[in-house]
Amino acid sequence: LAVNPDIEVLIECIGGSSGPAYKLVKAALNNKKHIITANKALLAIHGNELIKIAKKNDVTINYEAAIAGGIPVVKAIRENLKYNNISKVYGILNGTCNYILSRMEREGKDFLSVLKDAQKLGFAEIDPTFDIKGIDATHKITLLSSLAFDIPIKFSQTYTEGIDKIELDDFRFASEFGYKIKLLGIAERKQNSYEQRVHPCLIREDSEVAKVNNELNA
C-alpha cells in the first residue's frame, strides 16, 4: 500500500501508537501519499515527526475523526479560529468518562458499578485504562493545542489525571456548592508559555459544559 503508485490517499484504521500503523503511515508519507486517520495515539506520540515528513513531501495528514466524535473541531480551528488568536481551548473530550461521571452523579452508583455497565453497553473498552486514566483525552488535547497555538505536539509534557479516584462523596460536596464534576482537557496560552492538562474539574451547574451528559463530548 505504501509504495503502490496507483494509491494517492491512505486511510489508516489499524490503531495504536507504534507497530504496523506507525510504519505504514511513515512509509506512505515518504512515498507522497496523503493520510486520513482517527488514530490520536499515533499522532500524539509521533505527530511531530510525521507532520515534518508530510510537509517535506507536500502531502497532508487529516484526522478530524480523532477528536471529539462528530464535532468538526479540527476543521474549525484549521480554517477559521486559528487566525483569531485563540487564548484557551477546553472541553469534554472523552465520552466514556463523561458517561461514567453522569451516571454516578444522577444515580448515586459507585465508579466500578457504572464502569461495568459502560463496558456491557459498549461505551467502555474491555481494558478501559486509556479512558479512565485520562490518557485518551490527553492525546486529544495535545493535538488541539498544537493546532490552536501552532506549536509542536507535547503529549509527554501534559499533566494527566483520570476519574478512577472520584467517589460519590465528591459529587455530594460539589452539588452543595452548585457545581458538577467533569473530566476536561484544557490548553491555555500563558504570557510566555503554554499549559496543557487533563483532570476532573468543578464546573458551575449553569454553564453550558455542565449540561453535556452521558457519552457526549463538548
Describe each model-derived feature in a short phrase.
Residues 55-129, 135-136, 143:
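Rossmann-like NAD(P)H-binding beta-loop-alpha module
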Residues 215-218:
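Long, structured protein-protein interaction/assembly regions in large complexes
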Residues 113-211:
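Substrate-binding/catalytic subdomain of NAD(P)-dependent oxidoreductase enzymes
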Residues 16-31, 38-79:
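Rossmann-fold NAD(P)-binding glycine/threonine-rich loop
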